Each structure stands twice: as C-alpha cells, then as structure tokens.
Amino acid sequence: MTLVPVKYLLDVADTNIKLECVSANGTDFSYLECGSGKLALLLHGFPDTAQTWRHLMPQLAAAGYRAVAPFMRGYAPSAVPSDGCYQTAMLARDANALHEKLGGDSESVIIGHDWGAPSCYGAAIDAPSRWRQVVGMAVPPTAALGMAFVQNLEQIKKSWYMFFFQHGLADLVVGANNHAFIEMLWRDWSPGYDASFDL
C-alpha cells in the first residue's frame, strides 16, 4: 500500500481540527480529529472526503464527543490498498478496526453519509456491541435500496453512477482531464457549491 500526498486545506488553528494517522485493518489511515470524549466515527461518501465533516466536527466536540473523520481507504492522504479492495464488507472492517485502534468503547457512535452509510451499517452488523448509535444518511440499508431499485425508476436514475463504476470504463473516465468527471458530479449534485475545498 502507498500513502498518497494531499494538500491539507483546513486551517487547524481556526477549527481545532487536527490531522492524525493510524494503521488499522492493514491500511494506513489519515483522519481528522476534534474534541475529546466518546468516539464519534464519521465515514464520508463519494466524491467527498473526510473534510465533508469539518462543519459538524466542532459541534460534536462541543457536545462531548471525540469526532474522528477518516479519509477512507484509497482517499488521499490515506493509503491506497495494494489489493484494491473497496467492497462494503472491507470498509465495515476498516470502521471496526478504527474503533479499536482509536480506543472506542460500547458508547461509540458511527455516522455514515452516502458511500459511508452502508459501511456504518456493516460495521454495526459485524460488531453491534461496539456502537451505541448508528446513523446512516442518504443511502438506506441494502435491502431497502434494492427494493427502491425494483419499485422506483427515479431511484435507478439517481443511482446511475453506482452502476457506471462497476464497469472498467469508469477507471478511464474518472481520471481523464484532471478528474473533470468528479467536478461534473459536484456541479450536478451540489449546484453553486465550491467543491475545491473538498477535492
């Protein structure tokens, strides 16, 4: 596995958010951390990064949590795993390994957005005693999502990119033109939002 460089964009002095590193589940993870207290593990979605949580982290810290937002495997500055494994089950194992490495206990909370939501569901299913609360946003549990695909054409339209990424063409398209595809997704999904801070 290799650590990939990233331009760290947060002004740590202004936010009380710091960048840390830990090795868990055979991968080196960089993560943002704010506050002390019970662990609140924040799993980002796609095309987001851990910086997505920068506005929520100080609020969680003020509520008595140690908010930790890892850059998920393959997202700079975390490592790119040599096995290329990004399945939900592996991401769930990452979350439980991070829980252990970061000193989590049975009062810990896990929050996942988008791609991070199935990972947090999986982590809770694999090790329910680790998590007091599980919060999934923007993506329902797998069975409900499957039913939505069967019953709701609009959901299939909104989820086109999930199917696109299953094809080898995605590797070519996503990296082309300095990742213009990712910028296009940001413009489409969040009109008017300046995503340069998050990329």
Task: Describe the residue ranges of each PLM region.
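Flexible "cap/lid" subdomain of the alpha/beta-hydrolase fold that forms the substrate-access gate
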Residues: 2-20, 28-29, 68, 75-111, ...
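Conserved HGGG/HGGXW glycine-rich cap/lid loop of the alpha/beta-hydrolase fold
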Residues: 30-79
